[in-house]
C-alpha cells in the first residue's frame, strides 16, 4: 500500500463544503479510480459528495433525508442532540463503487457515482424498505411529541456471501439478502447499539451497551454464538455517546481475536477475546487492560489493530466543536497494547500523552505510522490543529503538520483517511482538508 504523508514540505488543501451553513464531511471512501466519495452532514440533511482528487472540485452530490435528531436539535436549539446520534453516519463502498447506507427513512440504499460524457452524477441502484421491522414514530415538525417508538438504522455491513447485516440504535439486528429481498430480524432485548460492528468469516461481532456478541446467520436469522458482558460503568462520560463501549469491535490477529473497550468508572479498559474456539485451559476473554488516567478516560472511536497489537486514543473531556469552550479539559493519551504470543494476557507496549479530542485514527502499513489529529493551545486561547504521526513500534512522534487555527479546522469527531496514492484527508467542521507531498 502507498505510504501516508511523511514529508518536511507538505501541501495542504482545504475545501469548504456547503453554502452559508457549512457541512462537516466525516466519512471518506475512495472509488476504484481514486475519487473521494464523502458523507457530509449538516443541520438540514446529509449528502453524498463526489470530488476530483486533484482539484477538490465537487463533481456530484446526492441528498439524503434529514434525520429526526436534526429537526429536534433545531426546534429545541440543542446541537448536542445531533452529536448523540450515530444513525446514517456509517457507510461502506462495495466492489462496484456503490455506497451502501441505511438512511433516516429506514431504507437500505445502494447509490453510486456514474459518469457520462465527462459529467458525473449519483444514481440509486437499489433501495429496500425496513419500516416493517423498525419503528418510526419519530420527531418531526408536525410530530413534536411522538408517543410511539422511534428507532434508526445505524450501520449496514456485508458478510463474505454478500448478505447485508444491519443494526439499529435500540438494539434491533437483521439480515437482508439483496438477491431475493428476504429480511429476517430480531433484537437484543433493549440493549443499545451506538457503534458500527465487525464482520469476519466466523460471523458478526456486535457490541451493545452491555455486552459483546458473536453472531452467525441461521437461515438468515442472526443467532448468538457467544456473549461476553463487560463493565459498563455507572453513567455516560464526557467524551462518549452513551453508557457503554465507545468503540466499534475490531478484528485482529488474523481473525483469531476481537477487541473493544469497556466503560469502567475509574479507567476504561481494552478487552481482547477469542473469536471462535477457546484453547484448553484458557477463557474466552484473553485480557482486560485498564488504560489512561484515573477518572480521566473515555473513548468514542474505533481502535487501530495490526497483527496482535491494538492502539487506542483517549477522548475524555471533549464534547463537540459547537459547544466546547475549555480545551484544557481534554485529557489526552494514546496507548498500544499487545496480545502475548502464548495468549496468557496482554501488555502495554508504549504510551503517549498526545491530546486527540475526537478523530478516528488511521495507520499506514506503507510506513508504519499511525496518524492522529491533535492541537496545541495558543496564548490567545485558540487552537493550532495538526496532523500528527506516531511510530507504531515506539510511539514516538515522527510527523507533525500544522493545518490551521480556529473552529473551521476542528475535526469534530470526523475521521482521517489515507487515499490509495497516500494523500491524507481529514474531515473538518466546515468540510475537509487534504495533505499531500509537494
Q: What spans do the regions from the language model cover?
A:
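Conserved beta-propeller blade signature
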Residues: 36-39, 98-102, 163-167, 203-206, ...
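Repeated scaffold domains used in trafficking and secretory/extracellular systems
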Residues: 20-30, 68-92, 132-156, 190-201, ...
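Residue-level detector of Asp-centered blade-edge/turn motifs that repeat once per structural unit
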Residues: 30-34, 93-96, 158-161, 199-201, ...
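Beta-strand-rich domains and repeat architectures in extracellular enzymes and scaffolds
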Residues: 1-48, 86-97
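Structural motif
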Residues: 43-52, 105-119, 170-177, 210-216, ...
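Surface-exposed loop and turn segments in beta-propeller and other repeat-based domains
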Residues: 4-16, 61-82, 121-147, 190, ...
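Blade-level signature of beta-propeller repeat domains, shared across WD40, Kelch, NHL, RCC1
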Residues: 410-438
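Loop/turn-rich, solvent-exposed surfaces of beta-rich toroidal or solenoidal domains
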Residues: 256-260, 300-406
Amino acid at each position: 500500500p502507498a505510504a501516508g504523508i511523511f514529508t518536511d514540505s507538505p501541501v495542504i488543501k482545504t475545501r469548504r463544503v456547503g453554502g452559508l451553513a457549512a457541512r462537516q464531511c466525516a466519512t471518506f471512501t475512495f472509488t476504484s479510480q481514486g475519487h473521494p466519495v464523502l458523507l457530509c452532514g449538516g443541520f438540514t440533511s446529509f449528502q453524498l459528495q463526489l470530488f476530483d482528487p486533484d482539484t477538490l472540485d465537487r463533481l456530484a452530490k446526492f441528498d439524503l433525508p434529514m434525520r429526526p435528531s436534526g429537526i429536534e436539535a433545531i426546534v429545541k436549539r440543542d446541537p448536542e442532540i445531533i452529536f448523540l446520534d450515530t444513525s446514517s453516519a456509517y457507510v461502506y463502498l462495495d466492489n462496484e463503487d456503490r455506497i451502501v447506507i441505511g438512511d433516516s427513512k429506514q431504507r437500505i440504499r445502494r447509490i453510486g457515482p456514474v459518469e457520462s460524457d465527462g459529467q458525473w452524477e449519483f444514481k440509486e441502484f437499489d433501495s429496500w424498505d425496513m419500516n416493517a421491522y423498525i419503528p418510526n414514530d419519530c420527531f418531526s415538525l408536525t410530530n413534536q411529541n411522538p408517543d410511539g417508538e422511534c428507532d434508526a438504522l445505524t450501520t449496514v455491513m456485508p458478510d463474505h456471501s454478500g448478505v447485508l447485516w444491519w443494526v439499529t440504535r435500540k438494539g434491533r439486528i437483521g439480515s437482508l439478502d439483496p438477491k431475493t429481498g428476504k429480511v429476517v430480524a430480531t433484537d437484543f432485548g433493549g440493549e443499545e447499539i451506538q457503534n458500527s460492528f465487525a464482520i469476519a468469516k466466523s460471523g458478526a461481532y456486535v457490541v451493545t451497551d452491555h455486552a459483546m456478541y458473536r453472531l452467525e446467520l441461521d437461515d438468515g436469522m442472526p443467532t448468538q454464538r457467544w456473549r461476553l458482558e463487560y463493565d459498563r460503568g455507572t453513567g455516560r462520560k464526557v467524551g462518549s455517546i452513551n453508557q457503554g463501549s465507545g468503540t466499534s469491535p475490531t478484528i485482529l490477529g488474523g481473525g483469531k481475536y476481537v477487541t473493544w473497550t469497556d466503560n469502567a468508572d475509574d479507567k476504561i479498559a481494552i478487552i481482547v477475546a477469542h473469536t471462535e474456539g477457546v484453547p484448553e485451559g484458557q477463557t474466552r476473554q484473553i485480557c482486560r487492560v485498564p488504560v489512561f488516567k484515573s477518572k480521566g478516560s473515555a473513548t468514542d472511536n474505533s481502535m487501530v489493530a495490526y497483527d496482535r497489537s491494538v492502539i487506542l486514543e483517549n477522548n475524555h473531556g471533549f464534547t463537540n466543536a459547537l459547544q466546547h469552550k475549555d480545551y484544557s479539559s481534554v485529557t489526552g493519551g494514546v496507548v498500544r497494547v499487545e496480545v502475548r504470543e502464548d495468549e496468557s494476557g496482554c501488555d502495554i507496549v508504549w504510551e503517549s500523552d498526545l491530546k486527540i479530542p475526537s478523530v478516528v485514527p488511521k495507520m499506514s502499513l506503507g510506513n508504519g505510522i499511525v496518524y492522529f489529529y491533535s492541537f496545541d493551545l495558543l496564548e490567545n486561547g485558540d487552537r493550532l490543529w495538526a496532523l500528527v504521526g506516531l511510530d507504531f513500534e515506539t510511539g514516538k512522534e515522527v510527523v507533525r503538520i500544522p493545518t490551521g487555527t480556529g473552529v473551521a479546522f476542528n475535526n469534530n469527531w470526523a475521521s482521517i483517511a489515507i487515499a490509495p496514492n497516500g494523500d491524507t484527508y481529514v474531515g473538518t467542521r466546515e468540510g475537509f482538508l487534504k495533505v499531500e507531498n509537494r
